[in-house]
Amino acid sequence: MKTKNVNLLFALVAVLLFGFSCFCISRMNQTNNQLINCRNHVLEFKETMLRLKNKSENNHQNLVKVLHQLKHKVAPAKPSGSILEKKVNMLDQDETVFNQFEVLKFFLPHLRTAGNIYPDIAIGRQRAGVSFALGITTIDRGNHTYLKQTLTSVLSRMTPEEEEDSVVIVSVADTDENYLKSVVHMVKTRFRKQVQSGALEVISIPALFYPQTLLEKKTTKNAKNWQIKQVLDFCILMLYAQPKATYYLQLEDDIVAKKMYFTKMKDFVNSVTSKDWFYIEFSVLGFIGKLFRSKDLMDFVHFFLIFYRAKPIDVLLDDIALLRMCSFGGPLRSCLQLKREVRVQYKPSLFQHVGTHSSFPGREQHLKDHYY
């Protein structure tokens, strides 16, 4: 009996050991499969990371190449002992002018099926070959307008000789025809002499220049579109002004100028000792009072159009100055020093911002140039 019990015990232990062995073998197989799957995932992850790394390196090389090209696209200007580095000749063919605007078709696909594109000229004698073109963009601000005050300040503080050697261009960047009519009427009534002499022009930008989304009614939800359209407004005005003068001065429709601002500006440009200044600031606010060589305007416009949806134009201007002078990965301190050499500042500022009602409906701004 005792032997029988021992045999049963051995049999039970054997069964238990067999079951445990089967369980262990099963778990080992599962673990092995999991390890194999894990290893496959790790290998797949490594391959993915390697592809991403290679792609990133390629993108980085391409980006550096593009930035390098942009950086050296605008050649340093040669020094000149005269205020006039080069007089721009009168345009002989309309085709020459139209080509200025063909660049828009590369960045704005909706224009690629259009024919010749050019702003509408509401008032103007097509003056060219002058030293300075002064550009002012304007849109309807509802019941608030500063344009007449701005034009009075800008034009009345020129000498007759300075007025003869310049052209002020007002660009109406508003699709409301009534606003265009009001601007034309005001200009013809208040500044008849300058209109007749060709010192003052008014152009209008047709709606077809803009992507349709930028023409939607302005709301707080699409405030970004207002900023985007503003960049295009400036670019179009720059393209129009580029063949007219040696220098281009950017103003806005809600500023006033200091007495003798034009004389001071002209004398300062002639006295700048830097051989390769990029642009000169006659105001520290935004895009107001920025002076460019007209021959450089196309390069600025190219850069602005590449990033016109990304940032306001004054920020893009700061970016291109950094790009112009700073090496990729170079020290920030030396970069900022080089930037100051190409972005020349004139103090005290020659222009002051006076508008409080923004061109964006319902928005107020109380920006002042403290160096004015």
Swiss-Prot record:
Expressing tissues: Testis.
Signal peptide: none
GO cellular component, one term: endoplasmic reticulum-Golgi intermediate compartment
GO terms of molecular function: acetylglucosaminyltransferase activity
Regions that span the bilayer: 9-29
Example of a GO biological process term: protein N-linked glycosylation
Disulfide bonds: none
Keyword Cell membrane: no
Post-translational modification: N-glycosylated. O-glycosylated; further modified with terminal sialic acid residues.
Cytoplasmic side: 1-8
Topological domains annotated Lumenal: 30-372
Keywords (A to Z) from UniProt: Differentiation, Endoplasmic reticulum, Glycoprotein, Golgi apparatus, Membrane, Signal-anchor, Spermatogenesis, Transmembrane, Transmembrane helix
InterPro entries named in the record: Glyco_transf_54 (IPR006759)
Membrane topology: Single-pass type II membrane protein
Subcellular location: Golgi apparatus membrane; Endoplasmic reticulum membrane
Keyword Ribonucleoprotein: no
Glycosylation sites: 54, 143
Superkingdom as given in the UniProt entry: Eukaryota
Role: May play a role in male spermatogenesis. In vitro acts as inhibitor of MGAT1 activity causing cell surface proteins to carry mainly high mannose N-glycans. The function is mediated by its lumenal domain and occurs specifically in the Golgi. A catalytic glucosyltransferase activity is not detected. May be involved in regulation of Sertoli-germ cell interactions during specific stages of spermatogenesis.
Family matches, as PANTHER family: ALPHA-1,3-MANNOSYL-GLYCOPROTEIN 4-BETA-N-ACETYLGLUCOSAMINYLTRANSFERASE-LIKE PROTEIN MGAT4D, N-ACETYLGLUCOSAMINYLTRANSFERASE VI
Subunit structure: May self-associate; specifically in the endoplasmic reticulum prior to its translocation to the Golgi. Interacts with MGAT1, MGAT3 and MAN2A2; may interact with MGTA1 specifically in the Golgi.
Family: Belongs to the glycosyltransferase 54 family.
Protein name from the UniProt record: Alpha-1,3-mannosyl-glycoprotein 4-beta-N-acetylglucosaminyltransferase-like protein MGAT4D
Organism (species): Rattus norvegicus (Rat)
Organism placement in taxonomy: Eukaryota, Metazoa, Chordata, Craniata, Vertebrata
Gene it is expressed from: Mgat4d
